[in-house]
Amino acid sequence: MRSVLSFEKLDSIGEGTYGIVSKGRDKETGRIVALKKVKIGQQDKDGIPLTSLREIQILKEIKHPNIVSLLEVVIGSTGDKIYLVFEYLEHDVASLIDNINKPFKLSEIKCFLLQLLRAVEYLHSHWIIHRDLKCSNLLYGNNGNLKLADFGLARKFGYPIESITPCMVTLWYRSPELLLGCQKYSTAVDLWSIGSIFGELLIGRPLITGNNEVDQIMRIFNLLGEPNEQIWPGFSSLPNFKRLNNIPHQPYNNLRELVPTISDTAFDLLNQLLTYDPTKRITASDAIKHPFFYENPFPQSIEMMPKFPTISKSFKNQNKKQNNNFNNFVQNNQTNQNNQTNQNNQTNQNNKTSQNNNMDSYKYSK
Protein backbone atom coordinates (compact mmCIF):
# COMPACT_ATOMS: atom_id res chain seq x y z
CA MET A 1 0.00 0.00 0.00
CA ARG A 2 1.38 3.38 -1.01
CA SER A 3 1.63 6.45 1.21
CA VAL A 4 -0.12 9.77 0.71
CA LEU A 5 3.40 11.18 0.37
CA SER A 6 3.30 9.73 -3.15
CA PHE A 7 0.98 12.62 -3.99
CA GLU A 8 1.48 16.37 -4.14
CA LYS A 9 -1.41 18.31 -2.64
CA LEU A 10 -2.58 21.05 -5.02
CA ASP A 11 -5.77 22.56 -3.65
CA SER A 12 -8.57 22.02 -1.17
CA ILE A 13 -11.80 20.92 -2.83
CA GLY A 14 -14.19 20.70 0.10
CA GLU A 15 -15.22 18.98 3.30
CA GLY A 16 -18.12 16.61 3.75
CA THR A 17 -19.62 14.74 6.65
CA TYR A 18 -17.22 11.83 6.36
CA GLY A 19 -14.08 13.21 4.77
CA ILE A 20 -11.95 16.11 3.61
CA VAL A 21 -11.27 16.19 -0.14
CA SER A 22 -8.21 17.71 -1.82
CA LYS A 23 -6.92 17.90 -5.36
CA GLY A 24 -3.59 16.14 -5.79
CA ARG A 25 -1.02 14.98 -8.31
CA ASP A 26 0.52 11.52 -8.41
CA LYS A 27 4.27 12.16 -8.27
CA GLU A 28 5.01 8.99 -10.26
CA THR A 29 2.56 9.39 -13.13
CA GLY A 30 1.57 13.07 -13.01
CA ARG A 31 -2.10 12.11 -12.94
CA ILE A 32 -4.45 14.58 -11.25
CA VAL A 33 -6.60 12.88 -8.60
CA ALA A 34 -8.98 13.66 -5.76
CA LEU A 35 -7.74 12.64 -2.29
CA LYS A 36 -10.39 11.99 0.33
CA LYS A 37 -8.96 12.00 3.84
CA VAL A 38 -11.14 9.78 5.99
CA LYS A 39 -12.27 11.30 9.26
CA ILE A 40 -11.50 8.99 12.17
CA GLY A 41 -13.54 9.93 15.22
CA GLN A 42 -13.14 8.90 18.85
CA GLN A 43 -15.29 5.83 18.29
CA ASP A 44 -13.10 4.73 15.37
CA LYS A 45 -9.78 4.45 17.22
CA ASP A 46 -9.57 0.74 16.57
CA GLY A 47 -10.11 0.90 12.83
CA ILE A 48 -11.57 2.49 9.72
CA PRO A 49 -15.05 4.04 10.09
CA LEU A 50 -17.93 1.85 8.93
CA THR A 51 -19.01 4.44 6.38
CA SER A 52 -15.58 4.33 4.74
CA LEU A 53 -15.48 0.53 4.77
CA ARG A 54 -18.86 0.47 3.01
CA GLU A 55 -17.71 3.04 0.49
CA ILE A 56 -14.52 1.11 -0.29
CA GLN A 57 -16.32 -2.21 -0.54
CA ILE A 58 -19.08 -0.91 -2.80
CA LEU A 59 -16.80 1.07 -5.11
CA LYS A 60 -14.50 -1.91 -5.57
CA GLU A 61 -17.46 -4.02 -6.70
CA ILE A 62 -18.99 -1.62 -9.23
CA LYS A 63 -17.85 -0.02 -12.46
CA HIS A 64 -19.90 2.38 -14.56
CA PRO A 65 -19.03 5.38 -16.77
CA ASN A 66 -21.28 7.63 -14.66
CA ILE A 67 -19.91 6.55 -11.27
CA VAL A 68 -16.64 7.96 -9.95
CA SER A 69 -13.79 5.43 -9.88
CA LEU A 70 -11.87 4.57 -6.71
CA LEU A 71 -8.28 4.23 -7.92
CA GLU A 72 -6.59 3.08 -4.71
CA VAL A 73 -6.45 3.42 -0.94
CA VAL A 74 -3.29 4.89 0.62
CA ILE A 75 -2.10 5.42 4.18
CA GLY A 76 -1.28 8.75 5.81
CA SER A 77 2.25 9.95 6.42
CA THR A 78 2.12 8.77 10.06
CA GLY A 79 0.31 5.54 9.32
CA ASP A 80 -2.78 6.36 11.40
CA LYS A 81 -4.93 7.82 8.62
CA ILE A 82 -6.19 6.59 5.28
CA TYR A 83 -6.93 8.38 2.04
CA LEU A 84 -9.22 7.26 -0.76
CA VAL A 85 -7.80 8.17 -4.17
CA PHE A 86 -10.46 8.96 -6.79
CA GLU A 87 -10.40 10.06 -10.40
CA TYR A 88 -10.62 13.84 -10.57
CA LEU A 89 -13.41 15.85 -12.17
CA GLU A 90 -13.29 19.62 -12.32
CA HIS A 91 -16.68 20.52 -10.86
CA ASP A 92 -19.68 19.50 -8.84
CA VAL A 93 -23.13 20.48 -10.07
CA ALA A 94 -24.05 22.40 -6.90
CA SER A 95 -21.07 24.75 -7.35
CA LEU A 96 -21.98 25.30 -10.99
CA ILE A 97 -25.54 26.24 -10.06
CA ASP A 98 -24.31 28.61 -7.34
CA ASN A 99 -21.75 30.36 -9.52
CA ILE A 100 -23.52 30.54 -12.86
CA ASN A 101 -26.65 32.10 -11.35
CA LYS A 102 -28.76 31.00 -14.30
CA PRO A 103 -30.57 27.75 -15.04
CA PHE A 104 -29.03 25.31 -17.48
CA LYS A 105 -30.56 24.90 -20.92
CA LEU A 106 -33.22 22.19 -21.02
CA SER A 107 -31.13 20.11 -23.43
CA GLU A 108 -28.25 20.23 -20.93
CA ILE A 109 -30.54 19.30 -18.04
CA LYS A 110 -31.68 16.27 -20.04
CA CYS A 111 -28.06 15.23 -20.57
CA PHE A 112 -27.32 15.62 -16.84
CA LEU A 113 -30.46 13.74 -15.84
CA LEU A 114 -29.95 10.84 -18.23
CA GLN A 115 -26.41 10.28 -16.99
CA LEU A 116 -27.59 10.36 -13.37
CA LEU A 117 -30.47 7.98 -14.07
CA ARG A 118 -28.14 5.52 -15.80
CA ALA A 119 -25.82 5.51 -12.80
CA VAL A 120 -28.71 4.97 -10.38
CA GLU A 121 -30.29 2.30 -12.60
CA TYR A 122 -26.96 0.46 -12.50
CA LEU A 123 -26.74 0.74 -8.70
CA HIS A 124 -30.29 -0.49 -8.16
CA SER A 125 -29.74 -3.43 -10.52
CA HIS A 126 -26.82 -4.36 -8.26
CA TRP A 127 -28.95 -4.07 -5.11
CA ILE A 128 -27.35 -0.84 -3.92
CA ILE A 129 -29.13 2.29 -2.64
CA HIS A 130 -27.02 5.45 -2.72
CA ARG A 131 -29.01 7.27 0.00
CA ASP A 132 -27.30 10.64 -0.44
CA LEU A 133 -28.12 11.90 -3.92
CA LYS A 134 -27.74 15.68 -4.17
CA CYS A 135 -26.17 18.18 -6.54
CA SER A 136 -22.94 18.43 -4.54
CA ASN A 137 -22.42 14.68 -5.01
CA LEU A 138 -22.72 14.94 -8.79
CA LEU A 139 -19.29 15.56 -10.31
CA TYR A 140 -18.95 17.10 -13.75
CA GLY A 141 -15.96 17.02 -16.06
CA ASN A 142 -15.24 19.47 -18.84
CA ASN A 143 -15.53 16.54 -21.25
CA GLY A 144 -19.28 16.57 -20.54
CA ASN A 145 -19.35 13.51 -18.30
CA LEU A 146 -21.38 13.50 -15.09
CA LYS A 147 -20.35 11.04 -12.37
CA LEU A 148 -22.02 10.08 -9.13
CA ALA A 149 -19.77 10.32 -6.06
CA ASP A 150 -19.70 9.97 -2.26
CA PHE A 151 -20.82 6.46 -1.38
CA GLY A 152 -20.29 6.88 2.37
CA LEU A 153 -24.00 6.35 3.06
CA ALA A 154 -24.64 3.79 0.32
CA ARG A 155 -25.61 0.31 1.33
CA LYS A 156 -26.81 -2.94 -0.13
CA PHE A 157 -30.38 -4.07 0.30
CA GLY A 158 -32.14 -7.36 -0.13
CA TYR A 159 -35.54 -8.95 -0.45
CA PRO A 160 -37.59 -9.05 1.67
CA ILE A 161 -36.73 -5.47 2.62
CA GLU A 162 -35.18 -5.18 6.07
CA SER A 163 -35.19 -2.26 8.48
CA ILE A 164 -32.66 0.46 7.62
CA THR A 165 -31.77 3.71 9.37
CA PRO A 166 -34.11 6.38 7.90
CA CYS A 167 -32.11 9.56 8.67
CA MET A 168 -29.49 9.28 5.96
CA VAL A 169 -30.41 11.33 2.90
CA THR A 170 -29.56 15.05 3.17
CA LEU A 171 -32.67 16.86 4.45
CA TRP A 172 -33.64 18.85 1.33
CA TYR A 173 -33.47 15.70 -0.82
CA ARG A 174 -35.10 13.34 1.66
CA SER A 175 -38.28 11.54 0.65
CA PRO A 176 -41.56 11.83 2.61
CA GLU A 177 -41.42 8.22 3.81
CA LEU A 178 -37.99 8.82 5.34
CA LEU A 179 -39.12 12.07 6.95
CA LEU A 180 -42.04 10.19 8.49
CA GLY A 181 -39.72 7.55 9.96
CA CYS A 182 -40.20 4.62 7.58
CA GLN A 183 -37.47 2.02 8.20
CA LYS A 184 -38.36 -0.52 5.52
CA TYR A 185 -37.56 1.47 2.44
CA SER A 186 -35.89 0.70 -0.84
CA THR A 187 -34.71 2.25 -4.11
CA ALA A 188 -37.62 4.72 -4.33
CA VAL A 189 -35.84 7.04 -1.87
CA ASP A 190 -33.15 7.65 -4.50
CA LEU A 191 -35.78 8.54 -7.11
CA TRP A 192 -37.32 11.20 -4.86
CA SER A 193 -33.84 12.70 -4.51
CA ILE A 194 -33.48 12.68 -8.31
CA GLY A 195 -36.80 14.53 -8.55
CA SER A 196 -35.44 17.15 -6.15
CA ILE A 197 -32.27 17.44 -8.25
CA PHE A 198 -34.35 17.74 -11.45
CA GLY A 199 -36.35 20.57 -9.90
CA GLU A 200 -33.18 22.30 -8.73
CA LEU A 201 -31.69 22.17 -12.22
CA LEU A 202 -34.89 23.65 -13.65
CA ILE A 203 -35.24 26.60 -11.26
CA GLY A 204 -31.59 27.18 -10.33
CA ARG A 205 -32.01 26.66 -6.59
CA PRO A 206 -32.97 23.84 -4.20
CA LEU A 207 -36.60 22.87 -4.58
CA ILE A 208 -37.71 22.38 -0.96
CA THR A 209 -35.55 23.93 1.77
CA GLY A 210 -36.83 22.95 5.21
CA ASN A 211 -35.04 23.93 8.43
CA ASN A 212 -35.66 20.57 10.11
CA GLU A 213 -37.53 17.33 9.46
CA VAL A 214 -40.93 18.66 10.52
CA ASP A 215 -40.49 21.87 8.53
CA GLN A 216 -39.35 19.87 5.50
CA ILE A 217 -42.39 17.57 5.48
CA MET A 218 -44.72 20.54 6.02
CA ARG A 219 -43.16 22.34 3.05
CA ILE A 220 -43.64 19.20 0.95
CA PHE A 221 -47.32 19.07 1.98
CA ASN A 222 -47.74 22.75 1.08
CA LEU A 223 -46.11 22.25 -2.31
CA LEU A 224 -47.60 18.92 -3.38
CA GLY A 225 -50.82 18.95 -1.37
CA GLU A 226 -51.69 17.10 1.81
CA PRO A 227 -51.55 13.31 1.25
CA ASN A 228 -54.32 10.95 2.23
CA GLU A 229 -54.77 7.20 2.57
CA GLN A 230 -56.23 6.97 -0.91
CA ILE A 231 -53.13 8.30 -2.70
CA TRP A 232 -50.62 6.96 -0.16
CA PRO A 233 -51.97 3.97 1.77
CA GLY A 234 -50.42 3.56 5.23
CA PHE A 235 -48.72 6.95 5.45
CA SER A 236 -50.64 7.96 8.59
CA SER A 237 -49.29 4.89 10.39
CA LEU A 238 -45.64 5.86 9.93
CA PRO A 239 -43.81 6.57 13.22
CA ASN A 240 -43.24 10.30 12.83
CA PHE A 241 -46.71 11.17 11.56
CA LYS A 242 -47.98 11.52 15.13
CA ARG A 243 -45.36 14.22 15.77
CA LEU A 244 -46.96 16.51 13.22
CA ASN A 245 -49.25 19.21 14.59
CA ASN A 246 -51.42 21.65 12.68
CA ILE A 247 -51.02 19.93 9.33
CA PRO A 248 -52.20 22.45 6.73
CA HIS A 249 -55.36 21.45 4.89
CA GLN A 250 -53.95 22.05 1.46
CA PRO A 251 -55.30 19.54 -1.08
CA TYR A 252 -53.79 21.11 -4.21
CA ASN A 253 -50.55 20.31 -6.00
CA ASN A 254 -48.78 23.65 -6.52
CA LEU A 255 -45.64 22.24 -8.12
CA ARG A 256 -46.63 23.55 -11.56
CA GLU A 257 -46.35 27.13 -10.28
CA LEU A 258 -42.62 26.64 -9.66
CA VAL A 259 -41.97 25.43 -13.20
CA PRO A 260 -44.60 27.18 -15.36
CA THR A 261 -42.59 27.18 -18.59
CA ILE A 262 -41.69 23.49 -18.92
CA SER A 263 -43.69 21.17 -21.15
CA ASP A 264 -46.45 18.92 -19.84
CA THR A 265 -44.19 15.96 -20.58
CA ALA A 266 -41.36 17.40 -18.48
CA PHE A 267 -43.79 18.15 -15.67
CA ASP A 268 -45.14 14.61 -15.83
CA LEU A 269 -41.67 13.16 -15.22
CA LEU A 270 -41.04 15.59 -12.35
CA ASN A 271 -44.40 14.67 -10.86
CA GLN A 272 -43.71 10.94 -11.15
CA LEU A 273 -40.36 11.36 -9.40
CA LEU A 274 -41.99 13.38 -6.61
CA THR A 275 -44.84 10.92 -6.02
CA TYR A 276 -45.85 10.41 -2.40
CA ASP A 277 -46.40 6.65 -2.50
CA PRO A 278 -42.96 5.03 -2.93
CA THR A 279 -44.54 1.95 -4.51
CA LYS A 280 -45.94 4.15 -7.29
CA ARG A 281 -42.87 6.35 -7.73
CA ILE A 282 -41.24 5.91 -11.13
CA THR A 283 -38.14 3.69 -11.29
CA ALA A 284 -34.81 4.72 -12.80
CA SER A 285 -35.30 2.30 -15.70
CA ASP A 286 -38.75 3.68 -16.53
CA ALA A 287 -37.58 7.28 -16.12
CA ILE A 288 -34.88 6.73 -18.75
CA LYS A 289 -37.62 5.67 -21.19
CA HIS A 290 -39.88 8.62 -20.38
CA PRO A 291 -41.12 10.67 -23.39
CA PHE A 292 -39.45 13.76 -21.89
CA PHE A 293 -36.14 12.59 -23.32
CA TYR A 294 -37.62 12.04 -26.79
CA GLU A 295 -39.12 15.48 -27.43
CA ASN A 296 -37.53 18.76 -28.49
CA PRO A 297 -35.13 19.96 -27.33
CA PHE A 298 -33.38 16.60 -27.34
CA PRO A 299 -30.68 15.79 -24.77
CA GLN A 300 -27.45 17.60 -25.53
CA SER A 301 -24.68 15.27 -26.69
CA ILE A 302 -21.92 14.81 -24.13
CA GLU A 303 -19.38 16.20 -26.59
CA MET A 304 -21.36 19.46 -26.90
CA MET A 305 -21.92 20.02 -23.18
CA PRO A 306 -20.49 23.32 -21.92
CA LYS A 307 -17.05 23.69 -20.37
CA PHE A 308 -16.53 25.77 -17.25
CA PRO A 309 -13.48 27.33 -15.61
CA THR A 310 -12.25 25.60 -12.47
CA ILE A 311 -13.99 26.96 -9.39
CA SER A 312 -11.51 26.93 -6.50
CA LYS A 313 -12.61 27.08 -2.89
CA SER A 314 -11.44 30.69 -2.68
CA PHE A 315 -13.27 31.53 -5.91
CA LYS A 316 -16.58 30.49 -4.35
CA ASN A 317 -16.15 33.26 -1.77
CA GLN A 318 -15.22 36.04 -4.19
CA ASN A 319 -17.31 39.16 -4.54
CA LYS A 320 -20.18 39.82 -6.90
CA LYS A 321 -18.02 41.53 -9.50
CA GLN A 322 -15.76 38.50 -9.84
CA ASN A 323 -18.80 36.22 -9.95
CA ASN A 324 -20.20 38.26 -12.82
CA ASN A 325 -16.91 37.81 -14.66
CA PHE A 326 -17.35 34.06 -14.27
CA ASN A 327 -20.88 34.29 -15.64
CA ASN A 328 -19.61 36.26 -18.64
CA PHE A 329 -16.96 33.61 -19.28
CA VAL A 330 -19.59 30.86 -19.24
CA GLN A 331 -22.01 32.78 -21.43
CA ASN A 332 -19.28 33.57 -23.96
CA ASN A 333 -18.16 29.93 -23.98
CA GLN A 334 -21.68 28.67 -24.61
CA THR A 335 -22.32 31.38 -27.23
CA ASN A 336 -19.15 30.46 -29.12
CA GLN A 337 -20.36 26.87 -29.51
CA ASN A 338 -23.16 28.10 -31.78
CA ASN A 339 -21.54 31.33 -32.98
CA GLN A 340 -21.70 30.53 -36.70
CA THR A 341 -25.40 29.69 -36.51
CA ASN A 342 -26.16 32.91 -34.69
CA GLN A 343 -24.23 34.96 -37.26
CA ASN A 344 -26.14 33.36 -40.12
CA ASN A 345 -29.46 34.02 -38.44
CA GLN A 346 -28.52 37.65 -37.83
CA THR A 347 -27.47 38.09 -41.46
CA ASN A 348 -30.78 36.67 -42.69
CA GLN A 349 -32.62 39.03 -40.40
CA ASN A 350 -30.78 42.08 -41.71
CA ASN A 351 -31.40 41.05 -45.33
CA LYS A 352 -35.12 40.71 -44.78
CA THR A 353 -35.30 44.08 -43.06
CA SER A 354 -33.46 45.90 -45.84
CA GLN A 355 -35.65 44.34 -48.56
CA ASN A 356 -38.83 45.91 -47.22
CA ASN A 357 -38.69 49.08 -45.16
CA ASN A 358 -42.42 48.84 -44.44
CA MET A 359 -42.11 45.52 -42.68
CA ASP A 360 -42.59 45.42 -38.95
CA SER A 361 -39.32 45.24 -37.05
CA TYR A 362 -37.96 41.74 -37.21
CA LYS A 363 -37.06 40.60 -33.74
CA TYR A 364 -34.14 38.25 -33.52
CA SER A 365 -34.28 35.65 -30.77
CA LYS A 366 -31.27 33.66 -29.75
Curated annotation (Swiss-Prot):
Chain segments carrying region Disordered = 315-366
Q: What Pfam families does this protein's entry cite?
A: Pkinase
A GO MF label: ATP binding
Q: Which UniProt key words apply to this protein?
A: ATP-binding, Kinase, Nucleotide-binding, Serine/threonine-protein kinase, Transferase
Q: Which GO terms describe its cellular component?
A: nucleus
Where on this chain does ATP bind?
I13, G14, E15, G16, T17, Y18, G19, I20, V21, K36
Q: Which BP terms does GO give this entry?
A: protein phosphorylation; regulation of cell cycle
**Catalytic activity entry:** L-seryl-[protein] + ATP = O-phospho-L-seryl-[protein] + ADP + H(+); L-threonyl-[protein] + ATP = O-phospho-L-threonyl-[protein] + ADP + H(+)
Domain of life of the source: Eukaryota
Active-site residue list? D132 (proton acceptor)
| Family annotation (PROSITE patterns) | PROTEIN_KINASE_ATP (PS00107), PROTEIN_KINASE_DOM (PS50011), PROTEIN_KINASE_ST (PS00108)
The membrane spanning regions, by residue number, are none
Please note every region of biased composition (Low complexity).
Answer: 315-358
* Keyword Nucleotide-binding included in the entry's annotation: yes
- What drives induction of this protein's expression? Up-regulated by Pseudomonas aeruginosa, PA14 strain infection but not by Pseudomonas aeruginosa, PA01 strain.
Q: Look up the signal peptide feature and give its range.
A: none
Residue ranges of the Protein kinase domain? 7-293
The EC number(s) given in the record are 2.7.11.22
PANTHER family, A to Z: CELL DIVISION PROTEIN KINASE, CYCLIN-DEPENDENT KINASE 11A-RELATED
Family named by the database record: Belongs to the protein kinase superfamily. CMGC Ser/Thr protein kinase family. CDC2/CDKX subfamily.
State the protein's name.
Probable cyclin-dependent kinase 10
The organism's lineage is: Eukaryota, Amoebozoa, Evosea, Eumycetozoa, Dictyostelia
